[in-house]
Amino acid sequence: MKRRHAIEFTLACAASVMFIGAMALLDEVPTPRYVFWPWVWLALITPVLEALCFRGLVQTELRQRFDRQFGPISAANLLTSAAFVALHWAQNPKAWVGLVVIPSLVYGYFRDRYDSVKSPIALHLLHNMLYFSLFGLPP
């Protein structure tokens, strides 16, 4: 991993920890329910599948069609993040959905910047593992 990539990746990991901390400050914190296999599915398998689908397929296809950039954020990243947030809209407390936007844009940034889904997968894994370890499974 090149130095710049390592620094950006470390900052993204730190941001993920901060976003999980921000979620803890909200009033709508779910009651933890620890069940091993659902935790494995939600914390480990789902982030890989979502990253492959959204970053590997959707964002890659949109990137080929839309070449527009808004600073470091591509139009493909914005559109993919909108779809990602919409997917999470029905599954989460509404106050938390806004906190999905920034991590999604970060995952997309790494997809665009390094032309790989490895970093988005690793970041999404970290995010979900922290989230479900701290807050448990949804009821």
Residue ranges of predicted features:
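Short acidic/polar alpha-helix capping motifs at helix-coil junctions
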Residues: 5-10, 70-74
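Transmembrane helix-loop-helix hairpins at the membrane interface
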Residues: 19-24, 33-139
